[in-house]
Amino acid sequence: MQQFLWYRRAVLGAMAALGARPLTALAEPFTAQADPFALGVASGAPSRDGFVLWTRLVGRGARPLLAGAIPVRYEVAEDEGFHDIVRTGEVRADPQAAHSVHLELAGLRSGRPHHYRFHALGATSPVGRTATVPDQADRLRLALTSCQHWELGWFGAYRDMLAGDPDLIVQVGDYIYETSYPDQPKVRDFGAPEPRDLDGYRARYALYRTDPHLQEAHRRVPWLVTWDDHEVLNDYAALANREGLPPDMFAARRAAAYQAYFEHMPIRPSLWRAMASPRLYRGVDWGELVSLSMLDTRQFRSSPPCAAPTVAHNVRLNHCTERSRPDRTMLGQAQEAWLARRLAAERRPWTLLAQGVFFAPLALDGTGDTVYSDQWDGYAAARSRLLDQLGRPNVRNTLVLSGDVHSFWLNELHQAEDKPPVATEIVTSALAAQSPPPGRFGDVHANNPHIRFSDLNHSGYVRIEIEPKRLGAQFRALDLKSAQAAPSILKQVEHGAV
């Protein structure tokens, strides 16, 4: 089976409300001097018999093309020389989807590497490499990453990531940043104002995709992705936002950001039928070894507790009973019910949940009474419900994968303080973004005995290797101011299966 995205713009009215520029405003005709594949290729959402292949056609300087639908030929082979071609065909790159291609393939042999390429406008794309999931897996190697700010650091960590030969790259949010930080030293410049409409978000993603390290990581490894907040606006919660925009206006901006995200990610188009409220959460099983659930912790959450409705902030536990109200949700009712069903049916030896924000309780001050409401601490009842599900006998060896806080953490997760842990949380630092300001988290270990490790001073990512009876994790730090920096290992974790 194969599908191509025939894009239906469900948000034209919303874009008009934002005063979005027409598609041609920043576009140009294709010329022979332009490389239509300047943004590279990518793959994602692997399954036992398929995956999604991505590319986007652009003009000179990675600007949008001034053109109608463009035919794109594709080839998929089990060998790099394309002697054993297993799929070939033609799809269309539609201008309403920024001439992006999302090719959803199925019916391929499991556990096989595959190579792919596209042909369009007289040019041929780089050759991408991906793989189908094995039926019986004895190992999964993945790289956990988040938070990459174009201006604040180089993306050289991807070079070290690829040296570890991962099966998957799991990106848990802040793939782009919408805003600049003028008080931080820059290594390069956005060259454009903060995006607020579809053209702006498209241009921001196109800029990111010109980075050679990021482009190579997409070319060589399949990705699983979810978003956090900076793909739209810092600390937004559903339609609550820091700028105080009315819900209809922020819904228009969010829909533009979501559309641009989809246009630049190797995501199955079947999850994006309603662009104004797409479904990003989904499950991926790695043979009979790992059950991995990708979660969306932004789109459906309740507003921040005990705050002006637009702003998440520090709250005192004794003064904010709202955070524990049972009707408050981080995932939304539909996603929470979907995850509960998935966990109830769990039978694999390892269970992974990948999501955007800090999950464990985190007391921030000397009294242990202050928490940050943007994290799961602002949604205590929802966290308790999920921990109860993770405590079921059939759910074993659970790992929560998180990002957002620009620092490394290793946390035990308990249903109650006097009970043994039901899961472990690994939090990756930013791949390229500023570290937290001094004192941001206080004396974390004094008031948080469930925290086993933290490093607040380094950027980088986490390598994770899972086998039937073993999990290994390396917290790898790299200097974000150098594209060629060598890694240092901050902590090595070895954990046996139950």
Stretch-by-stretch model annotation:
Residues 2-20, 26-498:
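Metal-dependent phosphoester/phosphodiester hydrolase catalytic core
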